Amino acid sequence: MNTNEAKEYLARREIPQLFESLLNGLMCSKPEDPVEYLESCLQKVKELGGCDKVKWDTFVSQEKKTLPPLNGGQSRRSFLRNVMPENSNFPYRRYDRLPPIHQFSIESDTDLSETAELIEEYEVFDPTRPRPKIILVIGGPGSGKGTQSLKIAERYGFQYISVGELLRKKIHSTSSNRKWSLIAKIITTGELAPQETTITEIKQKLMQMPDEVGIVIDGFPRDVAQALSFEDQICTPDLVVFLACTNQRLKERLLKRAEQQGRPDDNLKATQRRLMNFKQNAAPLVKYFQEKGLIMTFDADRDEDEVFYDISMAVDSKLFPNKEAAAGSSDLDPSMMLDTGEVIDTGSDYEDQGDDQLNVFGEDTMGGFMEDLKKCKIIFMIGGPGSGKGTQCGKLAEKYGFTHLSTDELLQNELSSESGRSKLIRDIMERGELVPSGIILELLKEAMVASLSNTKGFLIDGYPREVKQGEEFGRRIGDPHLVICMDCSADTMTNRLLQRSRNSPQADDNTTTIAKRLETYYRASIPVVAYYETKTQLHKINAEGTPEEVFLQLCTAIDSIF
């Protein structure tokens, strides 16, 4: 490699900027173990997304300290004016005043900055008063962030901040300002506004709201670097709401909004660029908040009222958990909570993990898992309690090499874990409410992906329990290749459950609970069976006979399809 190639490599990889940032951090922090310190800094560079995200002060401490009085009446000095040593042998030349340069940066060029807009180290919230609850609402352009943010603010009496609207108003009111004219051009092309400028505007807006109990911030952060900056300069949010939406739906909504509102950043070129930026930045951003246990994901492809119903349940659970429980934890029965047919709409889809929407930006981002799932043989096993579907699924799995998944068991396993999602599920069940179908679908999808490499197909027991669940499964994963309905009379199922209760001391089956479960099953299963009769291969199996007789019928049905 010659000298020119080396220089080109260093410049292209932003190596000088990285070294400058590391050196500034070392000089300011003076760590006892510089090697360990540098390792932690390099790890942060990875989290930020690479060297191009690093600035000169990325590793400079953000601690707020009382500064000594300034001499000579000067109100502002360079932050690092005294960092460089006075030793004349020090290899770097120190300037009292930097020479002019031809290139400029919106954030640092003096021609583009106003004294009043310089970022100051100040407390955004009064430390002597309770800090307001902060909810960040993120999602792709057109995912409904503004709509849902306003609904959240109205329901809980919170204040609402739209970061996009904040910047647009600033641009409109300072149209003659060179800096903001450039920012306007950046936004119009679909790029992100400069990070520090955006943070400054948010801080100034927050300081105008000293008495709010809560604040909903829409459209920020857009990447991990912005998230880190928000936490460093403002606070750690109490909750992050992620509105997951397919690319196609986002495009449709943006085109419709462009016709109705005429926003400058909704032009076709800008829309494509914004979607690309979102797709690149969303996965690491979601992962970052997942690791902190702060994020909850919602399917935003649905009606806005359905989405908000799910969000409000999650906010109640996360931020206002001290509500009177409807049942003791020892009384929880997952199979009852999963039964449908109640008036409550369970067509929700929220979860505190973003795994579903490592494909939310388009299925390609799930690394091919979704395509592999769609190629797998999928069989739904529908039947009432006591119909024998669990027993038969076990035998079929052994014969055909299928993976047997029971929604009841998946829910029980999740409840026994210590995840944030398990706490949310338990809180919902303790209130006597139904577990949202989105959570069940997420548990199913995670289990299916985990078994992809060593299975020939999936037998899903006890799913779907309503038409909406089946529709959602078809849209998110794919339609089943076969739906089996275990046709069994109420008397037979009741007798089997009572026998099971006598054989298993832990079983809580009694005549009253059995009757209720059967009633719920019949009410919910009729439309499900009708739905699949018109849509796919549905086989009704006479489940009144012996296990061997029923198994033979099932094998015949499966062999006829596969």
UniProtKB/Swiss-Prot annotation:
Residues 133-316 are annotated as: Adenylate kinase 1. It holds the Pfam family ADK. One of its GO terms (biological process) is ATP metabolic process. Its main location: cytoplasm. It is an enzyme of class 2 (transferase). Residues 256-266 are annotated as: LID 1. ATP 1 binds at G142, S143, G144, K145, G146, T147, R257. SUPFAM superfamilies: Dimerization-anchoring domain of cAMP-dependent PK regulatory subunit, P-loop containing nucleoside triphosphate hydrolases. GO terms for cellular component: cytoplasm; cytosol. Monomer. This is Adenylate kinase isoenzyme 5. It comes from Bos taurus. The lineage of its organism: Eukaryota, Metazoa, Chordata, Craniata, Vertebrata. The gene is Ak5.
